[in-house]
Each structure stands twice: as structure tokens, then as C-alpha cells.
């Protein structure tokens, strides 16, 4: 037998799903046979007579065999003689109307029929309770959240046993949909506390709802607590990622790094967004080489696109990791994909640091040829330095003279020009002395 399933909640959205049960599973234990054989004795109710029982059993069989219209027709025939039926028999008739409409996914008619069941006074208390609770579930599935709460409160007013976790969860879901998060969180917390006290594992969708409620209440610390429990109990990739995000949001960068790194090692981080996030977290925490490695592997695996931006990220991370040599191929790949010369400029600067002056001069010239530079003066400075170290003093002076035209690098260029001119004279003097 299928059962009505509790509505599920996601991080930022709430959706309810209703799996339609078979004709007689909505209200547990109530079939024509059970109603006839085991009438509730907690209150005086009239008997379900054999004649009515057989007619209801026929309608039930027709519906169970898949002929809902024939089942409804049989019930219509019974309804024509309702004046001769007692309250319990009428209630059972509407009960089966409700079942058939429910199986036909006609929730409004099902609700109307079940409301007629509980409107009859002389019915067993068990039928009254189960039907009222089912009405709350149906109202929830039908999107009538105020009515859901009203039915739950009606059920609570006649229920003499401890409230069930299903009561608190359904009420919490309705309040969530109504955006009354304070009442919603109180109810879901009660359901979870009750399960904890009984030594039971809270259902996963309860924690999902609790997390969503705290998020809506702007209580990130509570969201973290719930997600920590979800990771421990259910170990799903999305919970690890969400917990990492919330650690970042609450300023717990070390915990964020630890949880995301662990998720990565378990193979939970597979999407482009998640791998980029891990790379950025590594970089933020001073683990630049790991940042570059994650991005490089993501590109190789085809998860992250081999774009200029991503290659440049790897290259800059390598620079931060003091792996200048390893940055070169990534800057080169980035440069191949764009029309501007910014990445050739970075190549020139890295080559200078590596004392590869021929390559630095070539890269600087390529950057100037492509153009589109934000700081053109820096390229002329790099070119001037490369030419100086190659002892191309005149070319060096020309490059620094171009840099001098830019206010940003004017003073530095002037100093270099003076220095290069002195070195040129010194080199000429030395050559003359050696002749």
C-alpha cells in the first residue's frame, strides 16, 4: 500500500509531493471489512449493517479492480438510499467517495467527501481522528496551507494521545509555506526533539526543513549546526558543499577549508562551481599550489572550460606559490585565446624574474603589438629591463623613454634612464680599456 508522503523542502524552495495510495490506504486500517468486523467501541456508534456492507464492498472491489467510474456509480446508487442509512453507514459511504476521488487525483472532491465523513456525529473516534489528519495532508497537497493548520488543530482538539511527529512536521511545513518561520521552526524543532528523546533518528527531510527554516530566519549559526548533523547522519555531497558555504558565510574559513578539502578527497566535488569554490578557498588560505592543481585537474577532466580566465587563474596561483617557471605555460595558453596583450605582459614580467631576458623582451614586444593594455608603461619598463640585461643599452633607453611618458612610471623610468646611460658609458670605457 502506498501512503501520503510528507512534503519535502529544499534550501531555498519548498515543494510538496503526494504519492497517491490505493483506495483504502489513506486512512490506516479502515476498509469495508475492518469497519464491519471491528467497530470502535470508545463511543456509541450505530452498526454497519450487512446489506450496506455488501454494497460498499462491491463499490470497493470495482475501484480496486481499476474501474473508478463503476465504483462511483455503485456509491451513487447507495447514496440514493441514504435516508434509510445511519450516520456510520453514511460516513463510510463518503469515506469511499473520498478514496476514489483521491485515487483519481481529484483532491478538491476528495476533501469535500472526507469533510462529510467527519461531519457525521456518530462515527468511531478512530475514524474521526484518522480522517481529520488525512484532511490536513490533503489540504497541504492541494496548496491550502491555512486549512491544513485548521484541520491539524481540529485533530489536536479531539486527540487524547501524545502528539505525533507527523503532526509537528506537517504543521511546520504549512507554516513554512505561509512564511511564518517562527511558528514553523518551533514545530519542526519539537518533532526532532521528540525523535531524539525517543532514541530515533530524525528523518532527513525534517532536517532539510529545519535548515531551510533557520536560513529563512537569517540564523546562519543554526544553519551550520543543522548541516553538521546532516553531514554526520547522511553524508551526502550536497550537504558537505552547503556546510562549506555556510562556514565561509559565518567567517569560519579554516573549517570551510577542512570540510571542502575532505569533500574533494571523497569525490563529492564534481561540478564546475564547486571545484572553482575549492580553488578559491585554497588560494584564500594561502595554499596557492593546491588551488592551481585543483583547477588544472578540473580543466583536464573537462569539468571546467579551458578558458583564458581559468588558465590565468592557474598561472597567478603558481606565482603565489613561488612556482614562477610552472606559471609560464598557463600564461601562454591564456594569451593564445585573447586579442589583448595582458597575458604577454605577465609573461614578460615572469621571464624578468626568472632572468630569461630574451624571452622577456619577446613577450614585452608581443604585448605591445597586441595592445589593449591597462598599464602599458609597465610593459615598457619590463622591456627596458630586459634590454638592459642583454646589454642592448640604446634599446633599453628607448623603452624607458616610452615609459617616462606615463605619469605612473615617470619617476622610475627617469631613474632607469640615468642608470642605463651610466652603465653604457661604463661599458664603453671598459671596452676601450681592453683594446
Residue map of PLM features:
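N-terminal leader/linker segments that initiate helical-solenoid repeat arrays
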Residues: 2-14, 19-115, 126-130, 141, ...
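Generic helix N-cap/helix-start motif at coil->alpha-helix transitions
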Residues: 48-57, 86-94, 124-134, 160-170, ...
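Alpha-helical adaptor scaffolds
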Residues: 308-322, 329-377
